[in-house]
Amino acid sequence: MPEIDMKPRSRDVTDGIEATAARGMLRAVGMGDEDWAKPQIGVASSWSEITPCNLSLDRLAQGAKEGVHAGGGYPLQFGTISVSDGISMGHEGMHFSLVSREVIADSVETVMMAERLDGSVLLAGCDKSLPGMLMAAARLDLSSVFLYAGSIAPGWVKLSDGTEKEVTIIDAFEAVGACKAGTMSQEDLTRIEKAICPGEGACGGMYTANTMASVAEALGMSLPGSAAPPSADRRRDYFAHRSGEAVVNLIAEGITARDIMTKEAFENAISVVMAFGGSTNAVLHLLAIAREAEVDLQLSDFNRIADRVPHLGDLKPFGRFVMNDVDRVGGVPVVMKALLDAGLLHGDVMTVTGRTMRENLEAMDLAELDGTVIRKMDDPIHATGGISVLHGSLAPEGAVVKTAGFDLDVFEGPARVFERERAAMDALTEGLISKGDVIVIRYEGPKGGPGMREMLAITGAIKGAGLGKDVLLLTDGRFSGGTTGLCIGHMAPEAVDAGPVAFVRDGDRIRVDIAARTLDLLVDEAELAARREGWAPLPPRYTRGVLAKYAKLVHSAAEGAITG
């Protein structure tokens, strides 16, 4: 077996007389003669002070750097951006959320390539920073380890009537709807506002950040057991140190990201998402990460896996528990062990430990599924996975629904069509939405939005208004991991690309059949053909800046809304 080169790229900046200037620069940041033989490890962090999701990352980056030193490498820390979905929700800022995923992946690639770093520890806390980091790892195909910031503890609120309960940020969005509908006082709304975020960490339910942290662990890109501990828990510092050591070991063993992120690993990740009832955003992000890893992952793979993996997690937004509770009952490895024992995971895939997933799980002292937070395999919440991909005349390329929270098998009703989210929110506030309506929000897709905004503001308001189980919401945009209710997103083709959603009119009958996985517009083809005559999309909202660039490059949601 050929000898492993511990410095597959950094030799460009440390070896020979031509690297004299580069070595001089590196001496100025602390390196010396004894360090030139060490692999250089990029420690990339999306730390910021803008949101609690990322507050732990500066601390964890220091731990990762210490681990790199202990493993025999030399760490070099750099930063990238992060966008807070909780802050940017419901206004113009949400156009920039999904775009940030691409900026993160591109910026990490740029630094890693320009500075000739040999491997990376990638740290993230917010929704889009997790897939952005994993996309960068897959694209670069270097030795890489991902580390999650950890989730926030749930808040506790006492309302004016004496009621006390746990709350998360999603309760705030729903409380806004209740306040507007006159069913909650401004005083209670303020009490909830003050309680939802008691400290650092990402949103606490099985929303997008925790879903993608579970994905990273199931993919094998994070250390076993590292996804579930809360942000403030000092076990995270242990995992940070171990992650730094692990990346140097991966270089020594010649293991790179694509050795880990195989088709089987992606199937494992999908299985874990289905079992937890995770965020629909996982579909979009897994497609994009797989594309970077040159893995052929299709929407059909999600339905195939959902058919055999039961939904076990009684987790918010639809259930009762949060990620802290998952940690309390054993974390992601407990779920993976149960799925593996049931023959629902590939055990022989490689992981960042340098061992297979099966070997990792066998080395851990794991409890059985607790039966409450995570239901037993023979007593699932649903017999099939928590996400389905629909097809039909209204979504020929597909649409995504979180079946974990969809209480009806069939819903049929008249369309109420809105150009973008604001118009729908105004109609709801004015009391113009009725039970049985199918709300259609279009021109919110990857290109037409642009940016494929999340519709949490409108879905929270719908639930707060008491209509959460009585109206169906369809969009070519997407939904927050915290969205509840009858919601179908990612409709493709999107409106700006002349998808069928562009030609829906008020009063058209729309039918969704969850069991059959169909979504249909009940309008005959001759009528639709007449509507297409002379049609033109809405003009672009942005003609300059990052969103204008993004709109020109982005692909369909059915392909993960990639830009490459």
UniProtKB/Swiss-Prot annotation:
The keyword Lyase applies. [2Fe-2S] cluster binds at C53, C126, C203. The keyword Amino-acid biosynthesis applies. Its EC number is 4.2.1.9. Pathway: Amino-acid biosynthesis; L-isoleucine biosynthesis; L-isoleucine from 2-oxobutanoate: step 3/4; Amino-acid biosynthesis; L-valine biosynthesis; L-valine from pyruvate: step 3/4. Mg(2+) binds at D85, D127, K128, E454. The modification N6-carboxylysine is found at K128. GO terms for biological process: isoleucine biosynthetic process; L-valine biosynthetic process. It holds the Pfam family ILV_EDD_C. SUPFAM superfamilies: IlvD/EDD N-terminal domain-like, LeuD/IlvD-like. Its cofactor is [2Fe-2S] cluster; Mg(2+). Binds 1 [2Fe-2S] cluster per subunit. This cluster acts as a Lewis acid cofactor. The active site is at S480. Keywords: 2Fe-2S, Amino-acid biosynthesis, Branched-chain amino acid biosynthesis, Iron, Iron-sulfur, Lyase, Magnesium, Metal-binding. Belongs to the IlvD/Edd family. Homodimer. This is Dihydroxy-acid dehydratase. It comes from Clavibacter michiganensis subsp. michiganensis (strain NCPPB 382).
